């Protein structure tokens, strides 16, 4: 027996009952970004593999273990994007968007792909909304991005469910000095490290700070801290960021072990986390990447950005029960028509109502059927009113107008009076 067709593990369908919450989140954030002066950019899903190897970094879990990579028919190595920043930087460089110090404030949304173990809140195809800013080096733009996300949580009704964790990774020189000290400390305790952390000792030792293994975290209690190796400029940048967050009353926690999972970050690093989703508690993360553009062959260009996971945010909205009820509102009107003349009249009336009453949710019966079957479908649809058209109604240019959710009587309404009558009924609800 052939295997039934189904979605690939970790790549999920987003069903009709789920999409209203997705659209609500995306629409809310798009409106917020527009108000802050950010422009949308749309990026390809496929990029040359080299882009991510150079940008994210060899030795990272993303590059070494998680990328979907293949050779195309020309022998080119292509990768389905595991994140959005590298592709956005590539687009900015390719199209000269940051030339001459021009400030770019961009956002994008779409699917990303990583070969990870699927679990609640973590999938192999997942969706992100990302924001990237170029040619602004100061802490003021870092603060703006964090405040922007804070405002989104407020709009969505989840501000009390998330916590901001903040850190500075310093300059590349400061990180190099700290890396040397951390490696020396951990080398003496190498055999006590978990296997993954032992591997990271030679590839990306700073990522050991982010280990979820309790025994490794216990070893790190006495480890040197990055803040002891910071340069004065990075300290000033971090103090400037904190001062701006303090000025607007945005609370945060300093987490010196927050290093983010990608190699390109420097100075500011931040995450918004929640304790409502179990192990997958990070719903948004980002930071500064001043060296990434030059790493791709461009001129040194300050950059900062963040990405948020749409699946996790939707899950958090559901967990907190803050999805507006009107997102799943039923139809306002269901049109029943009996006979071809009535079906034609119903179609014309429906379009007239859609033009007259913006935002109306109107269903026209499809597939004919008896009066009983059409009325049954009208009731099942959840519509508030039914519109009834038969031969007599068409001949007299009237409709039967029947409430379905209260005890009101059916009325006969002239076609010309219908838009005004229906609008008045909808306004009363």
Curated annotation (Swiss-Prot):
It catalyses: tRNA(His) + L-histidine + ATP = L-histidyl-tRNA(His) + AMP + diphosphate + H(+). The keyword Cytoplasm applies. GO terms for biological process: histidyl-tRNA aminoacylation. CDD domains: HisRS-like_core, HisRS_anticodon. It holds the Pfam family tRNA-synt_His. Coiled coil: none annotated. It comes from the Bacteria. PROSITE patterns: AA_TRNA_LIGASE_II (PS50862). One of its GO terms (molecular function) is ATP binding. Homodimer. Belongs to the class-II aminoacyl-tRNA synthetase family. This is Histidine--tRNA ligase.
């Amino acid at each position: 027996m052939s295997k039934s067709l189904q979605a690939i593990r970790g790549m999920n369908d987003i069903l009709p009952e789920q999409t209203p919450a997705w659209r609500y989140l995306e629409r809310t954030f798009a409106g917020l970004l527009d108000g802050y002066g950010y422009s949308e950019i749309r990026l390809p899903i496929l990029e040359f593999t080299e882009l991510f190897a150079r940008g994210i970094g060899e030795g990272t879990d993303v590059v070494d273990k998680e990328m979907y990579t293949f050779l195309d028919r020309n022998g080119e190595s292509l990768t389905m994007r595991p994140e959005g920043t590298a592709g956005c930087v590539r687009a900015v460089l390719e199209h000269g968007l940051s030339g001459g110090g021009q400030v770019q404030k961009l956002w994008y949304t779409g699917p990303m792909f990583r070969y990870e173990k699927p679990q609640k809140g973590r999938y192999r195809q997942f969706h992100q909304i990302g924001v990237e800013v170029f040619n602004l080096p100061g802490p003021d733009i870092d603060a703006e991005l964090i405040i922007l996300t804070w405002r989104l949580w407020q709009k969505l009704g989840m501000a009390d469910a998330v916590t901001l964790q903040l850190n500075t990774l310093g300059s590349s020189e400061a990180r190099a000095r700290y890396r040397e000290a951390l490696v020396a400390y951990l080398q003496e305790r190498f055999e006590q490290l978990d296997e993954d952390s032992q591997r990271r000792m030679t590839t990306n030792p700073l990522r050991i700070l982010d280990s979820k293994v309790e025994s490794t975290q216990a070893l790190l209690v006495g480890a040197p801290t990055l803040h002891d190796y910071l340069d004065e400029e990075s300290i000033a940048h971090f103090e400037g960021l904190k001062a701006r967050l303090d000025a607007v009353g945005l609370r945060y926690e300093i987490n010196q072990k927050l290093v983010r999972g990608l190699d390109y970050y420097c100075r500011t690093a931040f995450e918004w986390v929640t304790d409502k989703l179990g192990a997958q508690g990070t719903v948004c993360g980002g930071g500064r990447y001043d060296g990434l553009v030059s790493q791709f062959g461009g001129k040194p260009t300050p950059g900062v950005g963040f990405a948020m996971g749409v699946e996790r945010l939707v899950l958090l909205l559901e967990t907190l029960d803050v999805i507006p009820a009107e997102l799943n509102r039923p139809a306002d009107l269901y049109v029943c028509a009996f006979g071809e003349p009535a079906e034609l009249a119903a179609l014309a009336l429906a379009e007239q109502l859609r033009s007259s009453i913006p935002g109306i949710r109107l269903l026209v019966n499809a597939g004919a059927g008896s009066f009983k079957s059409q009325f049954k479908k009208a009731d099942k649809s959840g519509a508030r009113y039914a519109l009834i058209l038969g031969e007599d109604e068409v001949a007299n240019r009237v409709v039967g107008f029947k409430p379905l959710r209260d005890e009101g009587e059916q009325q006969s309404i002239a076609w010309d009076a219908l838009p005004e009558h229906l609008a008045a009924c909808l306004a009363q609800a």
